[in-house]
Amino acid sequence: VNDLTPDSGNEVRNADTLEKFFEGTDVEIARYESHPGRVSIVVTVPGDPEKEPLTLMGHTDVVPVDEPKWTKPPFDALIEDGKLYGRGAVDMLFITASMAAVTRKIAQEGNPGGTLAFVGMADEEARGGLGVKFMSEQHPDAFSWKNCLSETGGSHLPGALGFNVGEKGAGQRRLHVHGDAGHGSTPYGKDFAILKIGEVA
């Protein structure tokens, strides 16, 4: 559970599970620890370097729970009436598990075409400082960032298929502009600061 502190998350447990899942397959496995217990895992199925690579990236952390508000045990992965209940079942461990299963299947069958990588990334729920940011800054060549598929997040309507081409985030800036004070009733011919900041923003 990632409570937004560096010592939480403990994604090493999921990295261990994923590494065991790939035992006996012809893959390359690398682990990257950004902070004690905060492990991202990269599983690579080597392919033809002349062909396009593909990276499947899923995160392995989940957010905390307010357990009294849950009607099912949040960490038991309970299957009831064909439905899986648990923290992370929707965001996004079901996608991460599916990506791992597809990668293992392709590794077992061989010949992926281009190189296929599966990444179980730590620290997505806390903006990725110990996950994607760490990997991009400290280990940018651990896998191909080109043709990288990840989550769309949350739940969707049945039959809906969502695609994101980017990720929104906070980018706070302080802008200073200088101009004349004025009144909205006489806007013409004035050097209004609000007009300048509108052009910048």
Residue ranges and their predicted role:
Residues 172-185:
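The feature captures the short pre-catalytic strand/loop hairpin that immediately precedes
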Residues 84, 90-166:
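Acidic/histidine-rich catalytic neighborhood of metal-dependent amide-processing enzymes
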Residues 32-35, 58-60, 81, 121-122, ...:
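Fold-independent oxyanion-binding glycine-rich loops
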Residues 13, 17, 134, 196-199:
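Extracytoplasmic/secreted proteins, especially bacterial periplasmic and envelope-associated proteins
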Residues 5-13, 93, 188-191, 195:
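Soluble non-cytosolic domains of exported or imported proteins
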